[in-house]
Structure formats: C-alpha cells, structure tokens
Amino acid sequence: MRRGVRVAHTCGAGKEPVPPFRNQQTGTRCKMSTQSTQSKPVQNVSSGGAFYAGRGVTKTPTISHAKGIFFWDTDGKRYLDGSSGAVAANIGHGNERVREAMIEQAKRFSYVVRTAFTSEATETLCRMISELAGSGFDQTFLVSGGSEAIEATLKLARQYAVVTGQPKRSKIFARIPGYHGSTLGAAAVTGDPDRDQIFGPIMRIMPKIPAPLSYRIPEGYDVHSYADHCANELERQILVEGEDTVLAFIMEPVGGIATGALVAPNSYYSKVRKICDRYGVLLIFDEVMCGAGRTGTFLAAHHWPHALPDLVACAKGLSAGYTPLGAMIAPNRIVDKVVESGGFLHGHTYSGNPLSSAIGVAVLSELVNQDLMENAQRRGVILRQRLNALKDRSTTIGDVRGMGLLNAVEIVEDKATKAIFPASRQASYRASEIARDLGLHIYSRRAASGKFGEWFMAAPPLIITEPEIDLFMELLTETFRIFESENR
C-alpha cells in the first residue's frame, strides 16, 4: 500500500488519540435530493434564487427568527416545529449556550485542516460521543452530515475487509423501503426503486431485503412472524449471494422518513445480529435520524443491548441543526486494523471542523444537562397516546408508531382496507400544507410513489413541554378536520 498523508480524525473516550488514519483529501459539494419521479407541485425558481427539490410545497415562507419549538416568518407568523425541521432540531431553536459556544470558538479560529492540526473542540466532541455511545464504540470520525457519515461506514467496512484478508467481501445488504442518504454510495444502499431508475446507471445498486413493516403486512403474517420472515430473508440472501462476498448489512434500528418510524419486534434485532455473526457480516446502524437522544437513549441501539451494531452513522441531532455535522462511531477492533495497514483512505475538507465541533459539544452538553433523553422518552409516551386518540376519531389516520419523540402518523384513504390515496391527491403533502397554513410544521413523505404508504413525522424538539404538546395536538386536530373535509 502506498504511503500517504496521515490524519488524526479519531479520538477515543478519555484517552490520547489513536494513531491517525491515512487520508486522501477530497473537496465536497452541496447535496440536493430528488424524492421521486411522481408528479407533485414544485417551487417556482427564479434566476439567482435558491434551488431545492420540490416536495409538494409551492411556496416556502422566509423565516426571520426562532426560539424554543417555534419559528417566525418575515410576515410575523408563528409556526410550531412539529418535526424538528427534518427531525434534526433536537434541542430546539435559539439556544443561548450553543450560540455563546459558537461565538467563542469563532473568535479564536474557525478552521484548520485535519491533515496537519487538531483542536480542543474536536477532541472533546469525539470523547463525548464515544462516552455517550458506550462500551465498544471507541472511536469517532467527524463529517458534515448524514450522507457523509453513511459513506464513511461503508468505506471503513470495505477497507477493514481488505486489510483482514477478505477482499471478496463487497456486497452491502440493505432494506426496502429504506433511505440512507443522497450521495451515490448512500443511494446505492437506499431501498427506493424510483431513485434506482434515475441513478442506477451511475452507481452499483446493492442487494435489498424486505423491511419488517408493522402496518402493511403481507397476507398470512402477523407483526412477529413477518419480522422473522424478513430476518430469514437476510440469511437466505447471504447464502444466495455467497457468504464470503457479503460485507455488511445496513439498517435503521428505528425507521426514519422512508419507513415512518418503524420499530420491529425485539426478536428481529437479536436474530439479525446472530445472522451477521454467523457469516462474518458487519452490522451497520444508520442512526442519522434516530440517534443523539431522539428515541430516549443516546443511540437507539441502546434499546437492544444484546444486538449492538459494529458501526454507527449519526448526524442530525448531534448538532441539532445549528451546523452541518455527522459522525461515524467505530470500535477499536476495526479501526486498529485499518490504522495498522497505513490508515483510512477517506476524508473531507471539513472533517473535524473546529467551529462545528464546538457547537456539537454545546449541543450534547445541553442534551445531558437538561435531561432531554429522559424528556424524549416521557413526552413521547404522552404524544403517542394523544396521537392514537386522534387516530381513533379520524377517518384518514391509519397508524401511529414510533419510539421516544420519533413518531410517524400514516395517512390512508380507507382505514378498513389500508388503501392509500391516489397519487394525484398528494395526501401527505396536502396535510403538511394545511398544517403550515395553520402554523404547524410537519415533515411528510409518500414512500416509493406510495407503494409502501405515506405519512408525516411527529417528532418535535426534545425540549417540548406538556402544554406545548397540547398546542401541537390542537393544531394537528384542526389540520385533519380540514383535510378530511376536503376528502369526503
């Protein structure tokens, strides 16, 4: 292996940084996401304006300021952030301690290149993440967001296989439906046929197995037997592909927008872990959305201690929307082998950025000091009770599911048959539009052109209080009163 620049991207909890990863620096570009090929309203784009993918919203308000779980537009209208943006703003908006940490670091310096220097903020953040992640999660590799974190796990897994004498292992299994990011490597393990049609020719689409859906279950199964079937499919496909060719299996332990806060039966996690162990397959948890306290524990993986993953990708809540930030969390047993081989062949210009790191330290300090993980667990129970009560009164809410303050509300045309609305109705996006007009932000998705259903995320910031849950439910109830009156 040729020699290259060596970069200390990782640090362990409570100890000196391990020998640095080798790095090949790359530039980064802004990402944009295409949700599907189906017809839906798209924003008007004028010359010189910002360009984003249309998601069913024809005109987006311009936000002026934000505080707590609310933000205000330039016309003075207030919105309750019912989905924490894109399930990112975990500690709410306008936190003064985060702002002060941001200012203090910016006064000192905002950037150094990780091929040559480190910073106190970066080392502190790495230690905090590893300590919160717990035993077996020794090292942290900082990046700028979720897609980059996923890419890092895939590349570390592959390099580990090569340096340990397993070069044939290159196939990464994932679930359908599923979502792991917008970059090409992350898209290759995303279970979305619409995206595959567009981007498949420029990437290597990885094998998929069914996700253990809990609402739309095939005939002849119940929740538990279908979850068993899905786990068995993992083993069957490993044998079909050739066990010595399978590198990893990636999944969200608690689903994000692609599956609507899917939580499988406990037995599924232990069975998947045993299958991966049996065939030498690395288990990767995508905790970009469900990590950083969102489900009531720092990692969603902590709910299943008997089935911990080998690698974790985390983002969103790590910085709570205050800066682009993500992380790969890895054990020494994997990192050490790669480091000993000459270093990790990966990196980004902004990996370990000092300003983002200082913000991350402040955000995680708030998460711990304000006991927000416990609040997520406690308020999540209350919110699901209230959502289920609304479901019982509603003609178009088919299911409520989730864990902590990561929840989804599934929208159907017919509750008896679970039939979805026609694509032309754009039901979940219309519900979001009504909610926004009432002063409530909810994050919606029609998964794979509706093949797997449509829903919105009920995932407010972890700081939410009971009176604020009351207001959330008042606005959501009115949203569905209007929505259902339009669809009688």
Give, region by region, the residue ranges found by the protein language model.
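Basic polycationic patches enriched in arginine
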Residues: 2-6, 22, 29
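Short, low-complexity intrinsically disordered segments enriched in A/P/G/S/L with frequent Arg
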Residues: 8, 17-19
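Low-complexity, intrinsically disordered or signal/transmembrane-proximal segments
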Residues: 9, 24-25, 35
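Short, linear, compositionally biased motifs with a strong N-terminal bias
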Residues: 23-24, 361
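Conserved N-terminal phosphate-binding loop of PLP-dependent enzymes in the Aspartate aminotransferase
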Residues: 33-488
